[in-house]
Amino acid sequence: MTTTKTMLVAFVLTLFFVISSVHCSDGTSGYGITEATKRCFTPAPCTRGLFYCQTFCSSLSAVLIGVCESGICCCILNQ
């Protein structure tokens, strides 16, 4: 009886250890579901020129690139 309880406890602890050590990826293959790669703002940053639009986008995040499209500043995710 004692051996059975010991084996059961050892099995459960081993199972918990194995489950906790498994690393799962939350990424998806292909394009998948990702955050928006482009966000456009009011034309105010582009009225000062492309450099100001780029500065505006990089101030939001270091991975964004600013582009003026039809006078509207769009921040694009740098991939």
Curated annotation (Swiss-Prot):
Signal sequence segment: 1-24
Coiled coil: none
GO biological process terms, semicolon-separated: defense response to fungus; killing of cells of another organism
Disulfide topology: C40-C75, C46-C68, C53-C73, C57-C74
Location in the cell: Secreted
GO (cellular component) term, any one: extracellular region
Keyword tags: Antimicrobial, Disulfide bond, Fungicide, Plant defense, Secreted, Signal
Family assignment from sequence similarity: Belongs to the DEFL family.
Protein name: Defensin-like protein 117
Organism (species): Arabidopsis thaliana
